[in-house]
UniProtKB/Swiss-Prot annotation:
Transmembrane domains' residue ranges: 150-170
Keywords from the named record: Activation of host autophagy by virus, Disulfide bond, Glycoprotein, Host membrane, Host-virus interaction, Late protein, Membrane, Transmembrane, Transmembrane helix, Virion
Record's keyword annotation contains Transmembrane helix: yes
Taxonomy of the source species: Viruses, Varidnaviria, Bamfordvirae, Nucleocytoviricota, Pokkesviricetes
Membrane topology recorded in Swiss-Prot or TrEMBL: Single-pass membrane protein
Record PTM text: Contains intramolecular disulfide bonds.
Protein name in UniProt: Inner membrane protein E199L
Length: 200
């Protein structure tokens, strides 16, 4: 069964890799080197050469750059934009047929996964609202929804706004706790702050 990708976007986080792709026997016949790399990956013996054989959409080379395989089970680790896919994304972490790169192997063998991530072995639903796809991934894991904030630091403007809002809240709390006896200490209204920011 062919898995034609819905997009060929590098690091697309809204892909569930539910399509199993060509059967193992087909893969063995058509792509014997790739199958051998996957077998080595199962026992943590993959090499940099295997990484090149498997490739990815982002690399624009190898098995996982081909439309037929790009969003198949074999490519769930290398083509997923999910942060820490090897740690907490079931189609990658919970699938022995998903090739893990040497870098992903090292993260797992050295136990470098962040604490607090839930590894979902069965995902009932994977997806989310496209307009917040840069910020959130929602995993429905046995009816428990775990939301991970991802890629925030890749959006400096959003990070700056969050920091400004936090500082304003802290300043307000501090000025209100001091009794507000001095009118000079009062924070100007937010509309004035933002109008002053526009002057820069």
């Amino acid at each position: 069964m062919s898995c034609m990708p819905v997009s060929t976007k590098c690091n697309d986080i809204w892909v569930d890799f539910s399509c199993t792709g060509p059967s193992i026997s087909e893969l063995q016949k058509k792509e014997p080197k790739a199958w051998a790399a996957i077998v080595r990956s199962r026992t943590n013996q993959q090499t940099a050469e295997d990484d090149n054989i498997i490739g990815s959409i982002c690399d624009k080379q190898g098995l996982c750059s081909k439309d037929e395989y790009a969003y198949s089970q074999y490519c769930a680790c290398v083509n997923s934009g999910t942060l820490w896919a090897e740690c907490a994304f079931a189609p990658c972490n919970g699938n022995k047929n998903a090739y893990k790169t040497t870098e992903q192997r090292n993260i797992l063998t050295n136990k470098q996964c962040p604490s607090g991530l839930t590894i979902c072995q069965n995902i009932a639903e994977y997806g989310g609202s496209g307009n917040i796809s840069d910020l959130y991934q929602n995993f429905n894991c046995n009816s428990v929804i775990n939301t991970f904030l991802i890629n925030v630091m890749n959006h400096p403007f959003l990070t700056l706004i969050l920091i400004i809002l936090i500082l304003i809240i802290i300043y307000r709390l501090m000025s209100s706790s001091s009794g507000g006896k001095h009118n000079d200490d009062k924070l100007p209204p937010p509309s004035l702050i933002f109008s002053n920011l526009n002057n820069f």
